[in-house]
Amino acid sequence: MGDLESARGVLRDWLELEPGNAEALHLLASAGGLPVPVRASDAYIAEEFDAFAKSFDAKLEILGYKAPELVTAALASALSADDSAGDVLDAGCGTGLCSVLLRPMARRLDGVDLSRGMLSKATERGGYDDLECAELTGYMARHPSRWDSIVSADTLCYFGELHDVLSAAKVALKFRGLLVFSVEAAASEITGFLLQHNGRYAHARPYIEQSLAAVGLELLTIEHDTLRAEVMRPVRGWIVVARNSGIHRA
């Protein structure tokens, strides 16, 4: 409790010097000093990832980051033996860590991210047919029935409320299209979502299941796995595969 009080004090001092600073506002909310937002702000995401785009891949290698491998393996398992992933969206593509894994499965591979710094790295890595700098929910909503598969590795952990982003994904998927994503797993006593002190959200399995059902996405599989290590401890998450079965919800 004392550490959190100290952190809130530091963050409030920061905001006095820089009113409206997106990082300070988000971290203060994660420390319990402000109401929890339903998702991280666009400004926080863009500034946070622009700041460490150059060191992003090296840092994640140290942490044993596995989310790209886990989500692409889940996509491959959901496809029938003769199917490709078709037209694929890498949703929150970052530096393009998924591209080398998705490219062999995809007829076309598009990427979208809010951070221009991360997109610059993705361009250098290659493998994409198109890269766009945009907010994910709005971007998907503007492209109805565009993709056969949407893959999102560790992007939805910056969303607490999942309804809008999942609804947009359903709009963007073709009929029978697949959505594969990872999120961090909340502790067993949590029934919805939680903004953690690290600034990322964690989600409970029942909440994920309810959110998918609410927008008319059919849950195919949900697996519990280790996404990476943090402070020498495994970070557990959910690997989710859902299908657009054409069910319509209000």
Residue ranges and their predicted role:
Residues 1-47:
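N-terminal auxiliary segments of SAM/dcSAM-dependent transferases
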Residues 65-84:
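Conserved alpha-helix/loop element of class I SAM-dependent methyltransferases that forms part
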Residues 89, 94-140:
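Class I SAM-dependent methyltransferase SAM/SAH-binding core
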Residues 141-150:
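A short acidic, Gly/Pro-enriched loop at the edge of an enzyme's catalytic core
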Residues 163-175:
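A short glycine-rich, Lys/Arg-flanked "PGG" loop and its adjoining helix->strand segment in the class I
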Residues 181-201:
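Short, glycine-/aromatic-enriched active-site segment of Class I SAM-dependent methyltransferases
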Residues 200-216, 222:
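Short alpha-helix
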Residues 227-250:
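Core SAM-dependent methyltransferase catalytic element
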